[in-house]
Structures are given as structure tokens and as C-alpha cells.
Amino acid sequence: MKLDESKIIDIECDHIRTLEAKKITYRGLEIYAVKRSIYTSDTERAFLHKSGINTAWWCGYVEAVQDMQDSFGGRRCFEDNVIKLSCGNKTKEYILANVHGGYTYAFYGIPLVLNDGQRLFLGWDYNHWPDTEDCVTYQEILKEGMKVVDSMQEFQTT
């Protein structure tokens, strides 16, 4: 991953470490799958794994169509996991399955819509809590990201 792309995936919290990051381009938009951890050292993570404690989780970021920036309403509240798109008199809502915000959305106000100044991104945590590390795979993150891209492009053409 190029250095300038790191600001997209590191935008959330400075105490969260990126362990692995992968990117694909789908229908002209980028989808990132990122494995994160709150533990700072590999030694610490290895010790906790031996104790049966998972220490990381996958999350995803999807590039949004830039001219749709004004269409994203974000989450109404962090529990309901709904992205609302509005364009003129059209409104569409869709739910990201199995997404939850965790404490970061509640206390730090992390936005669902991320903007690095040039590109717009939607971001979500699938399994924010470390004890659910193995619940969601890299492939599932990409599959969900593709659904988001499909939904945005479908909305633009209706």
C-alpha cells in the first residue's frame, strides 16, 4: 500500500495499529480491508494469543462517488447501522449487515463518511471487539464493500 493511502485507513484513532491492509478496485472505486489491533507490540499480541485472547479485528473502507458527497447522511445514531443516500427528491437507505460501531463511534464520534480532501470514503467496523477476531474474514469485508458500491451506483442510475 502506498504511503499516501495510509491516511485513509489511519483516520480513525491514533492508538489503533494497522496489522494488515489490502485494497482492490471494483467498478472503478477502491475497497480497503484493514486488520486492526489496539495492542502495540507483536510480543504482547503473541502472549495474549497463547492465553486464548484474540487481539485484532477486520474493518472496511469503500470509496464513494465524489459527486455524491452531499448525498450521504451518515448514521442517524451509532446503533442502527444505516447509510442514507439522498439526491433531490430520491432517498434510499440500506443496512450494512453485521456492522456495529463499538465504543469508538459512541465516544470519539468517528464518522461513517471519511474524506481525505480528494476522495470520499465510507468506513465500517465489522467486529470491533477483539474477542470476535475470527468472525469476519477479509473476503467477507470485500464482499460487503462490493454491495455498498453496487448500491451507490444503482442509486445513481435510478
Question: What is the meaning of each model-derived region?
Answer:
Residues 61-120:
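Short, internal acidic amphipathic alpha-helical interface segments
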Residues 1-16:
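Charged, compositionally biased non-catalytic regions
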